[in-house]
Amino acid sequence: MMSRTVRLVLLALACTVDLSQASGFTENGLSLLSYQLCSYPVTRSVQKLQAVQTSHTAYVYCGGWIPWKKCPKTVYRTQYLAMDVPESRNVTDCCAGFEQLGLYCVLSLNRSREFASRPGVCPTAEAEPLSPSCSLDTDCSGLQKCCSWPGGRHCVSPTPTGTEKSMVSWYNVTVLVKVGFEDLQREDPGLRNHTRLLYSLVTSALQPLNPAVHYLTSTGGKDTFTTVSWLLMGFPRLMTVANVSVMLDDMVNRVYEVVSIQVQDVNECLHSELQACSVREQCRNLEGSYQCVSSQRLNHTDEDCPPIRDFVALNVTSSSFHVSWSLNSTQNYNFHIQVYKGKEILRSAWTRGHTMAVSDLEAGVLYRVRTSYLGCGANVSATLVVKTDAQVFQVTIRIMDRNLTEQILDCSSGEFWNFSRQLFHEVQNSFPQAISDLYRQGRLRMQIVSLQAGSLVVTLRLTLQDPDFSVGVHTLTPMLPVLSVSNVFQVDQQRTFVQDWDECAHSSEHDCHPSARCINLEGSYTCQCLTARDASPSRAGRVCEGDMVIPTGDELSVTTKVTVPAASTGITTFGPETLTESLSSKHPRSTPARSQTWTPVPPSVRDGGSIVRQDRNSTGQGQTHGTHQGTTDAPLHTTRESQELITKDPPFLTATTTGYVVWHSSPTWKTPPNSTRLQNEDPRSSSFPGPPSAPTDVTPESPACVPGPIGKVTVSNVTSTSFSLEWPADIRLSPAFHLTLVSPRGPAMTMETQNNNVTLSGLEWGTLYLVEIVAKVCGKEGARTQLKVRTVAQKLAGNVRITSMQYSESFLNTSSREHREFVELFFRTVRDSLPATLRQHMDAGRIRVDIINITNGSIVVEFNLLMTADLDVREVSAGFLNALQNTSMLEVVRGKTFMQDYNECDMKEDDCAPGTCRNTFGSFTCSCDEGGPDSQVEYSGRSCDGDPSGNMTQTPGSEWSPTPAGTRGVPVPIASSTAQDLPLRLNLMDAVSVSCEIETVIITIQKRFLQQAAIPEASLYLGEPSCNVSRSNSTHVFLVAGWGECGTILQSNMTTTVVTTTLRNNLSPEGVIHHPQFLSPIHCAFQNDVLTSSGYTPQWGVYTVIEDLHGTGNFVTEMQLYIGDSPIPQNYSVSASDEIKIEVGLHRQKSSLKVVLTECWATPSSNAKDPVTFSFINNSCPVPNTYTSVIQNGHSSKAQFKLRIFSFINNSIVYLHCKLRVCMENPRNSCRISCNDFRSLRSSEALHQMTWGPLHRTEGAQACTKPVLGTGYIILLAAAALLVVAGATTLLILRYQRVRQKYNLRIQTDDFSYQVFSQ
């Protein structure tokens, strides 16, 4: 009784609330997330009931002695009359100039000059006769316009106008929406509504920038259920790609149908409509813009192109700094200064001076400043790293009543935001008064750096800006007792502490010069040059110059000539400038990113002298109090550790009788304690630091004693542990050649030799080395020559998720006992699970496993797998994957355990320069670019000045045996493009997408991937060779397999239906392998349990592609209502006596799939989880007294039932919802169920929702109809009444006879000796 009362009360409340507002829509059906919504006051006439009293005279008995006498009496009666009353209210509708289109506000169709226009104006010359006809600009291809001519409207190339030239930045915008292109064309011929909807959304999202948006074209997406549209977008001021993308992300969040938006720079130089360079000028494309350079300036090749020097930072404070530079030139250049914070550009300015002030910055943040100018047809630039002043401390808090969960690791979840808000509030309240004052003044910033398990360990970073007093750990320690008695959290006093933040722990935390020592201080740090001179004493350790001598051991003295300037400099040709983030903790490998410097970290010694390489990666920005900065992964403050399963001791030098200098391995070699690694000029091009590539300036000397230049260096005999170098040189002056070898895993090493050839051995395999050679004579140095050489190895990357063990924060410490025990267990388990052949290769040192990272969740291990060139990389990959997935000692998640190719080209671990790197499975190949003969390096076997018809050879695997892996054969010269123009190399993961549909599995493969891997289209098939490519276009090939065809296996249980097939490519008829072979299982999983509501269709499933090409899909349901056999639309009105037939099922019929209804209910709103519900089907059977009858359930892909919905629901509006389960019919499993044995749906199973409705009660029907009895109940009651009457009558007759004693006495004829009394 109480439950029914509560439901009625909630229903009454729901009726009084505006249901449109509760559901996120206006009363006109507009989404409240739409743009261009305005509120208008509206006065409407509303009918209201008013009480009116009327009087009349009635005659009543007067009373008294004459009772029949009547007297007149005035009687008042209250009547309720409906009257029209004006009522004012605010209505939300589209703003002026916009009209409603579906759920959103768009420009009206008569404003086609805005949303369907192209840049430029129509030319004066008449169009060609064969020009296509058109009606709007969008009917034309490319950037053509639709212009009127005497013969009609035709598409022509436009003439630029001042409007387009005023636009500074032009970008291409790619929008992916959830609608099939064929369906879109059918519903919107000409795509007029689609065009104005895109235009309106994009322009509204970018307000108030006033962009120029031009629609280009649309086509179908990678599957049949998406559409890709391209827009051209211009801005009146310079905008970066990152900033535009962030603004358009709001459109993705607001508009459900938009899947993604991608912004790319436009090369204005290719389109005369977008640039204003004259005929005598040459257009040079820049990011977001372009430059016009005079031909005279381009042809002036002898013009001086001096480097930017003395680039330093001055007057650094917590919120500002000055930068200064010099240029040895008589010309007055215009310098472009850009200030970056990570990838985001904060400042962009031009100046003709040599100084620039930068203000309004954050305290304690590392900024990157880039200054550049245009000279001699090149872009000369210099980069400087500056960190603003601040005092930084670390607070570690262990909260015992909270656990680390997936929700709290998701920075976009409500649980994370609630937790961070409570934590910041508790920490703020625990501050001492002086610190609390700084916080209120905005001079203290709190940031969540990491969240770790056990129970929940939070690391906070406190950044203090310009405190008025001395702040140290002792100043913050008083907060701990207050925090430990928090009423919100149970804080562990033993594991909660304050400590200094060590900025010297990683180069991303300080701006010290690579040749300087970072010295950590309490709250801050300082830098000290290790060289002869500090060029900027005002900021010590930022600009170091001169020689640096490192203390040595007994075996080797390493002397390094430090020539790295304070700022990395470079000269690049004109073209798009790509600026990447300075450092990122999400980098997939432990290689340094752009502008990353390596701090001196002495190698850890383990197991009697084996070297464990160690490097740290930066911490990404965590959650900052008061801001919303992206997501935060766990752990937020990661330290990447790289450990080798098989390690080597560092090499040392010995001289041989042949004059060669050979490096050998020695267990007694010791690393110099203060060894310093050098910074490379452009860390993007290398996986390790090194000396700069710019030649050292040499003071002119007399020809009698001037070292000659190093000629072209020839690299030969490259193996996994050695290589040889040889170079021509003028030996008349007996020069000494100074060689420096830099490895990413060890200190820089130097040597001197009188010979012009050297063999380096005892090296690590699969490692990219940087070699610098300089000739010395008379105490003078000649020009330096640099080259990179990679030792031979095949390399893969792997990932495994282990669930049988819990992650521990001690895994971050490589010297901890827990870390060592886990690593030993992991190595031992992997080795023991390998086949005997691979186990022998590993024991012989031909296979090595390097652990790169160990992270939480439960335990995720990232590792690299290196192997010698003669091993079959695919066999090794399959063997390791099988060992990891089937190990008996560790329980792993098979879907999160995989082996994949390590892309040496993307990771810049190749030695192809100046050629182009092309990635292959396990290794890479090199090809020569134009200009290769001018290179100072020649690799034996791939000379760029050789036969131009030479063919590029593949790297070795089981298919290629002539050349060791990592060495390159004769390359293909590429004369038409440069390395910057080449597309990124695809792998199988990126090139293949899986679309899981009902009855069909569709595989889409990019043709570029097939061309890169030299795989013929004709060799591809699904399951069986007959199921080959179904269709293809210019960019993709498609393979389609129906369920039950092409070897497809269909399996189903109570929760999931899984469709499995295999993507293969066959061999050539000759049996010779001409291309890589792959065998990729494909799995499509569908959830059987679905929540279907009248009106919402869930998205089709798709596209998570991992190594073995998994995909997910959804059964798409539909609900249709009928009266009789006629379907009824939404917002239909029915009466209480109308019997509605409802059909629920799958979008497509499949004979083997049956639909079983488990539960159906109605709600007064579109929310299926509304607390007010009216159930009419439960456990697959009708609920009594709901006038519901099931027609069919579990017999086919459709379920049907009838009901009179308003016979038991008093509300005027209802929405219908049903849960259904997909069942596969087979002889052992029948989908037909009875009403007694069907299970209830588990609450944990996946549901999808759509909304139909509403259904309205017919006008004039009673608002609250009393329940009436059905025909069956009436008949039953009548029969019971008759039975009662008959029984009562019989009893009365019997009693009457007994009282009157009326009996019949007769003698029976049978032979009995007694009498029988009968009535």
From Swiss-Prot:
Domain ZP: 995-1238
Residues bearing carbohydrate: 90, 110, 172, 193, 243, 315, 717, 757, 951
Bias (Low complexity): 619-632
Extracellular membrane side: 23-1273
GO BP, sorted A to Z: adipose tissue development; cellular response to gonadotropin-releasing hormone; regulation of apoptotic process; regulation of developmental process; regulation of gene expression; regulation of granulosa cell apoptotic process; regulation of ovarian follicle development; regulation of reproductive process
Listed name of the protein: Uromodulin-like 1
Regions of compositional bias (Basic and acidic residues) in chain numbering: 638-647
Annotated organism of origin: Mus musculus
Record field: transmembrane: 1274-1294
Membrane topology per record: Single-pass type I membrane protein
Pfam family, one: fn3
